[in-house]
């Protein structure tokens, strides 16, 4: 692997910039982060037994290895999945599971403030292409997003809808290679349903947010707990004796109230 040649796109002078795998290399500091990230991922794996069972089956069967849905997929890479998700230890477990099935994964961060640099470094060492670092600006965000699209994905995985929107607005030549996508958030689903209503959505997108396992568990318990955790981290207040007002009664609101 060699260093990036074009400093205007992604200068390695950025102390926490890294990217993988083809044509790039980790800086020494970020290589040191990889070990820490690996431990985080292993911790998450120990608490995600269902996904680990799926990974074991994927590892045996390799369902994506020789999957060529379009004649244009002739590079032997198998199914190519482009992801714009939160780059966290939990997402890392998903990415490694898809890779175990024979897919080529390219990942960028859906939120500059949620990216865990050590986890991203560990994924690069696992052979997954990562275009993300914590705190990137708007220009770099879209640079990273377009690097994922440059891999010509067959499936998109979105958290907020930016991949699908970019494809339909500026990268329409990629649509012929795509068989479908997924969207995790209510925000993204609303965007895509509006596109479908207007007749401009060019490939099917699965609304992950509508799955029972999403709203009954993740929205209710996950968002409920993480919201309280965020309040505590931001304010350091004692909850005892406080009055809470929850505006809204969807599954997230119910979880917070619980």
Question: Predicted segments — roles?
Answer:
Residues 33, 51-54, 82-86, 90-91, ...:
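N-terminal cofactor/phosphate-binding cores enriched in small/glycine residues
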Residues 2-66, 76, 107-242:
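Glycine/serine-rich phosphate-binding loop and adjoining beta1-alpha1 elements at the start
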Residues 80-82, 245:
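Conserved beta-strand elements of the Class I
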Residues 67-70, 97, 101-104, 152:
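Extended, highly charged clamp/arch subdomains and adjacent linkers
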Residues 88-103, 218-258:
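Glycine-rich phosphate/diphosphate-binding loop of Rossmann-like nucleotide-binding domains
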Residues 82, 95-114:
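Active-site cofactor/substrate anionic-group-binding motifs, chiefly glycine-
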Residues 83-91, 111-115, 161-163, 250-252:
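Gly/Ser/Thr-rich loops at beta-strand to alpha-helix junctions
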